[in-house]
C-alpha cells in the first residue's frame, strides 16, 4: 500500500520491498515515480491498470516464471480495495506463485475508527453507482444490514449520494471523513440531514461511514401502514406510489403491504 495523504505512511517494510523487487507494477507510473524519488528508490516501473491488464498480466507472469519478484501498487492505499489488481492476483495464484500482502494505510479503516460508530462488525461497500436509480437499488439491498457500512465517494457526487441515502436508509447517524491524513483532514459527524447542510462545501476524496440498521428505528404494524397509504392517496398520490413510499418509510415488504391494503 502507498500513502493515502501523508508521505510518512510508508512503512519500513514496504520501502524495503520496493527496493528489493525486480519491478514495480503501478496503477499510474507518474504518481509512483514521485513516491520513489522521495525515498531515493530506483526500481524499474511498469504500467498495470484496469485498461491495460490484458497485456500487463502476461508480462508480470513471465517475470515471475523467470524467477523475479514483482510489487504491485495503486495510486493511494491498498491495491484491489476499490482499485485494480484482483485479476492479477487470481492469475498469479493460478500459475502457482505466492501472493503476500504488506500492511499500510487504508482510508476505510482510518475513517471507521475515528467515526464514533461501532467497529465490532462492519461492511466495506466501496463506491456506489454514479447513477441515482442504480445507487438507490444498491442501497435498498443493504438497508436492513445492522452493521456499520463504509462507502467511498467523489466530491462532485457527495450531495446526490447523501440525498439518496436519506431517502432509502432514513436519517441515520453517520460520519463524513475527507482529506484523510492530509493537512485539511476533517471528520463531520451527525445525522445524514446535518451532514447534508455542509456537504456542498466539502472537497477532496471522501469516505462515508454509515450507522447500521436498528430494529427500534421502525415500529411497524400493518394498520399504521395502511393508514399512511390512505393519507398519501387522499393528498393526490396514486395508490401504487403511496404503497411504495410507505413500504420504504416503514421498512416493510411492498408486496405484503399491497396485498394487505387491497384485502382490508
Please provide the spans of the model-predicted regions:
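Short active-site oxyanion
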Residues: 18-24, 96-100, 148-149
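A charged, well-structured terminal subsegment
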Residues: 63, 133-150
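A contiguous loop/helix-start segment that scaffolds small-molecule binding in enzyme catalytic cores
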Residues: 148, 155-263
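Glycine-rich, flexible N-terminal cofactor/catalytic loop recognition
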Residues: 1-51
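Short glycine-cluster motifs
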Residues: 65-125, 129
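Conserved helicase motor
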Residues: 47-54, 128-132
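General beta-strand structural signal in soluble alpha/beta enzymes
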Residues: 26, 101-104, 151, 176
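Short glycine-rich anion-binding loops that position phosphate/pyrophosphate groups of nucleotides
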Residues: 4-5, 75-79, 155-157, 213-215
